[in-house]
């Protein structure tokens, strides 16, 4: 099941109400940093697991 345009619109409205328009750029920036860190940790984890000898 995918999100349709109305569901996305509703989610955006809820986010605006919760965080306010002034704080939204900061929240999105923090979210982007979190996603970037998660991707980096996954990449590092894959490197470590590929360097381990097979058992």
Swiss-Prot record:
- Recite the UniProt keywords alphabetically: Cell membrane, Membrane, Protein transport, Translocation, Transmembrane, Transmembrane helix, Transport
A single GO BP: protein transport by the Tat complex
Query: Main location per UniProt?
Result: membrane
Cite a single GO MF annotation: protein transmembrane transporter activity
Which cell locations does it reside in? Answer: Cell membrane
Query: What GO CC terms are in its UniProt record?
Result: TAT protein transport complex
- In terms of superkingdom, the source organism counts as Bacteria
Q: So where does this one cross the membrane?
A: 1-21
Its placement in the membrane is given as:
Single-pass membrane protein
The protein's matches in HAMAP family, at most eight in alphabetical order, are given as: TatA_E
Q: How does it assemble?
A: The Tat system comprises two distinct complexes: a TatABC complex, containing multiple copies of TatA, TatB and TatC subunits, and a separate TatA complex, containing only TatA subunits. Substrates initially bind to the TatABC complex, which probably triggers association of the separate TatA complex to form the active translocon.
Give the function comment from the record: Part of the twin-arginine translocation (Tat) system that transports large folded proteins containing a characteristic twin-arginine motif in their signal peptide across membranes. TatA could form the protein-conducting channel of the Tat system.
Q: Which family does the similarity line name?
A: Belongs to the TatA/E family.
Identification of the protein by name: Sec-independent protein translocase protein TatA
Species for this entry? Wolbachia sp. subsp. Brugia malayi (strain TRS)
- Gene that encodes it: tatA
């Amino acid at each position: 099941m995918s999100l349709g345009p109305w569901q996305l619109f509703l989610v955006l409205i809820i986010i605006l109400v919760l965080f306010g328009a002034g704080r939204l750029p900061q929240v999105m920036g923090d979210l982007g940093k979190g996603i970037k860190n998660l991707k980096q940790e996954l990449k590092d984890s894959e490197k470590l697991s590929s360097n381990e000898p097979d058992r």
